[in-house]
Amino acid sequence: MTECWYIPEEVADRREENRLSPNVPGSYEALSEARVFFRHFDPKEVSDDIEGFIQPLLKKLNYHSYDVVNLSPATLGDEKFEALAEQHFMEHTHEDDEVRLILEGQGYFDVRDANDKWIRLLSKPGDCIVLPAGMYHRFTTDHSKCIKTLRIFKEAPRWIALNRGPETEEKPARKEYLARLHAPAETAVGAANSHTIFSLHYPLKLDAELTVITKRLLEQHSKQPLALMIFLTGSTDPTTGASWCPDCIPAKPQVAQRFAELQGKYGEERAIFLQLPVERAGYLGNPEYPYRKHPTLQLASVPTLLVLTPTKDAKEKGDVQWYDRLEVKMRTCDIDKADVLSLE
């Protein structure tokens, strides 16, 4: 996904960019919340070479079958191409995940976000997109009318387009998708409960959201100490079922142990946990990634664990950011050796 942005419900020409005015950019975090996964491969390395590229890719991602789809008037003829183009742009879903890697050309995937708004994804060679089963989406080429994609499957696919409507809403895949979409976020220490366990997905909204949470917690526990543990970890890769960050996988049980120790020290109601998932596509190779430049987080690598406690005058401070009320007592990437019991 080279870029993504929100588009209106109705568009006059599907092959135009159709941005809102003013433009409203999408984000990797909004896509992640909708369970869409994105990964980029070097465009020079992707091809329809079965032995040289496709078979090694299938093995790496633990997929078992594939096909190559070449859409253009030159390959299909004008009439068949336009008929397929109309069909692909109907809002629909599938009973299996849709995994597409762009080999040549470019086009737009439109997907519904968690609030049922359209996000348009500009997809070029090297872009790999995973759309979960049960998610409404549609596709169109741009005005070039030419795209070649590799589709890969875990098993033999049930590749039937289910157009949006009452019958599709009752399909198991759709119900399961909605259940996952609205389920509490899972963290290293349990499901988020908006009480003592939180998961915030949007880096650009972090300060506003955490400032509200921090102020409320300080008011609730005005006479007793509390501690906030922040865990920055790689988000889950649906092609493998695990974090894209290898070091983050063994770190999770270690974080759970450190948090249990924090609960023992401060009490279960006053030990607060916040997990911040880090999206691979937005983070890797990006020195401007918000958590890297954040004055308190100062993310250098994942996983990273921080523990913060209120400043002495935290309760007296007026309208300030969360990081002005809290001070960092511990910051580490070596979570197994972190000593939360010695915090003052």
From Swiss-Prot:
Subcellular location, record wording: Cytoplasm; Nucleus
Cellular component terms per the entry's GO annotation: cytoplasm; nucleus
Alphabetical UniProt keywords: Amino-acid biosynthesis, Cytoplasm, Dioxygenase, Iron, Metal-binding, Methionine biosynthesis, Nickel, Nucleus, Oxidoreductase
Keyword 4Fe-4S among UniProt keywords: no
Main EC class the enzyme belongs to: oxidoreductase
Regions crossing the membrane: none
Catalysed reaction, written as an equation: 1,2-dihydroxy-5-(methylsulfanyl)pent-1-en-3-one + O2 = 4-methylsulfanyl-2-oxobutanoate + formate + 2 H(+); 1,2-dihydroxy-5-(methylsulfanyl)pent-1-en-3-one + O2 = 3-(methylsulfanyl)propanoate + CO + formate + 2 H(+)
PANTHER family per the UniProt record, alphabetical: ACIREDUCTONE DIOXYGENASE (PTHR23418:SF0)
Protein's name in the database: Acireductone dioxygenase
Lineage of source species: Eukaryota, Discoba, Euglenozoa, Kinetoplastea, Metakinetoplastina
